[in-house]
Amino acid sequence: MNNFFNKISRAGLILAAIGIFLLVVSVPDTLVSFKAAKSFEDALYGDVEINAGDHVQGQVPYLFDHFAVEQTRTENKSNNSVTPWKTSRRYYVMPCGERFVGVSVGSSSLSVAEDLVDQTWGFLSGGADPTAELELDCRVVEMDEELAEMFRDELRDYYDFTDQEIEDMGPLLMMEGRAFTTIRVFSGVGLGFVVLGLIVLVRRWTKVSKVYQQNQDMM
């Protein structure tokens, strides 16, 4: 048993483990990123069907009010201070063919998203087409139950949908903005770590096995 563990490279195991972790967290989004992207405009008018696992990219033409907000704050344990709550993400409503979907927008795009919401309502009241340019690159996922419940409340309270109409929409979907280029890099780095870890493991195993074999031959 000791011989077996001596043949295993700790560095190789660590490298392989890091690589596997990076692959686990990045490969699903990497696969989505390589799918042909559907446009927000086609999704809006129902020209394409949107399902979980789809890749949606481009400019968002219209956007309704947010139905949920994600806030974060930072705690500094060294001086027991806490920063004020800060909005890091908002979840908006967007028409999508015969249904409605959620659109997740991060803090860097919130100002543009709010402008687009105001301009959308202005357009529906007889004003000009929206000019705010909200560009997103998204994966489509099913909402988690907490967001789904808030989304249902929003559709019932502000858009006059019945429970049956919401049920008929099928799974409630969320379009989540993703940094697909960065995610692909993580996948590549993860694969590199796995390969490097395997090389180190094989070399260590081969080297130590030869030493043990030589010792056995000398006995």
Task: Please annotate each region the language model reported.
Residues 77-81, 155-160, 191-195:
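Short, low-complexity, polar/charged sequence segments that are solvent-exposed and flexible
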Residues 44-137:
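Membrane-proximal low-complexity regions enriched in glycine and acidic/polar residues
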Residues 1-5, 124, 171:
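Short, aromatic- and cysteine-enriched interfacial helices/patches
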Residues 125-176:
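Extended, hydrophilic extramembrane loops/domains of integral membrane proteins
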Residues 209-219:
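Cytoplasmic C-terminal tails of single-pass
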Residues 109-123, 169-203:
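Extended, charge-rich, solvent-exposed interface segments
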Residues 1-40, 183-204:
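Hydrophobic secretory-pathway targeting helix
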Residues 27-51, 171-175:
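Alpha-helical transmembrane signal-anchor/signal-peptide segments
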